[in-house]
Amino acid sequence: MPVNRTIRAQSPGEFRLMSYGVNAYSKVSAAKEVPPRELEAILLMKGAAKLEAVKREWETKKDLTEALAYNRKLWTILVSSVTDETNPLPQNVKRDFSNLAIFVLQSLISLAAEPAVDKVNCVIDINSQIAAGLRA
């Protein structure tokens, strides 16, 4: 049986914090309705889109650092998930994905040290191809 409670904010700032909490919960609840493979595909495409945006502003390299950080974090999480011992994927798939993740992460590090459009294109292509495979 649900418990009804009235929560009163002691200050306007506290009310905003409660609102942020409700909004965050709503976003997480909505995300739970997306199948995991589709969510991974969406996140990979978001990473590709961030890098595409950098390409459009290549002369200034606007948002390069943020795009690289997003993709590094994403690939770190993906490889951690895939290689987890509780993941039911076959060992050869885990190994192959790990090798791909190492390549992508090295490409991102190289891109941070020496920015080049061909390196950006490589990561965009990999993100897009993996996303397409997840959606197939």
Model-derived segments and spans:
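N-terminal intrinsically disordered, cationic/polar leader segments
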Residues: 2-77, 83-84, 90, 94-136
